[in-house]
Amino acid sequence: MRWTKEELDRYHRQMILPQVGPEGQERLKRASVVVVGAGGLGVPVLQYLVAAGVGRVGVVEMDRVEVSNLHRQVLYTTEDVGEPKALVAQKRLQALNPLVRVEAYPVRLTSENALEILRPYDLVVDASDNFPTRYLVNDAAVLLGKPLVFGAIYQFDGQVAVFHHPTLHGEMGPCYRCLFPKPPPPGAVPSCAEAGVFGVLPAVVGSLMAAEALKVLLGIGKPLAGHLLLYDALEASFRKLTVRRNPRCPVCGDEPTQRELVDYEAFCGLR
């Protein structure tokens, strides 16, 4: 593949890595990723995927920018308050790297539109902040046969995993439901608005999520398939747990019983 001077100048320090090279950079250029959520976690994921040269990146986010977002969602500014996050993110990301294509979906992801929105992309990233969306994104990714990079944060703690992707041993790794078959009771886990979040935590966890996404796209290293990575910002410590696919999982098991998307608000006991 022939590279333009702008591409070589922009990606040179990534392309000289032996694990990437021109072939890996071409893989990124041809790849597509959709990120569900353009908040604390989604912002660093989007920034690093776009900067790395992933050819097509989708942004799914229904919320508008709020002042309370700005201590951790550094893609947005005070002037953006009240504007749709997806559209602001699209504009800023396109300015960051005009060589890639950024697609905005300023809508709520639902059982009715999830398959249509996620289907065109190679990889799905779940940067959402609520349980109905997490189960929805997981189930949609499994039904579509897409790998899923997952992240979550709470106060000073973060989690990262790669779901529905082969492990180093060759078997298919677990999905989100294999780890969490049932959601917690409504109100049992406070939101960031209720419990708070350390401002830099989303940047750390989101960057780890971006790294996992790039590893999967490039086919390098050891993606977190079959593992759950735990980060404690107060202790500056990491733990990596081994997790396995549940052969009886209703979505990704040997004989799945759920072959379509459901009402996830009802599934999570929210109505």
From Swiss-Prot:
GO terms for biological process: Mo-molybdopterin cofactor biosynthetic process; thiamine biosynthetic process; thiamine diphosphate biosynthetic process; tRNA processing. Keywords: ATP-binding, Isopeptide bond, Metal-binding, Molybdenum cofactor biosynthesis, Nucleotide-binding, Nucleotidyltransferase, Thiamine biosynthesis, Thioester bond, Transferase, tRNA processing, Ubl conjugation, Zinc. Conjugated to TtuB via a covalent linkage that likely involves a lysine residue. Is able to form a covalent thioester adduct with TtuB via Cys-192 in vitro. The gene is ttuC. NCBIfam families: PRK05690.1 (NF004281). The keyword Nucleotidyltransferase applies. It comes from Thermus thermophilus (strain ATCC BAA-163 / DSM 7039 / HB27). Disulfide bonds: none annotated. Zn(2+) binds at C175, C178, C249, C252. This is Sulfur carrier protein adenylyltransferase. Its EC number is 2.7.7.80, 2.7.7.73, 2.7.7.-. InterPro entries: ThiF/MoeB/HesA, ThiF_NAD_FAD-bd, Ubiquitin-activating_enz.
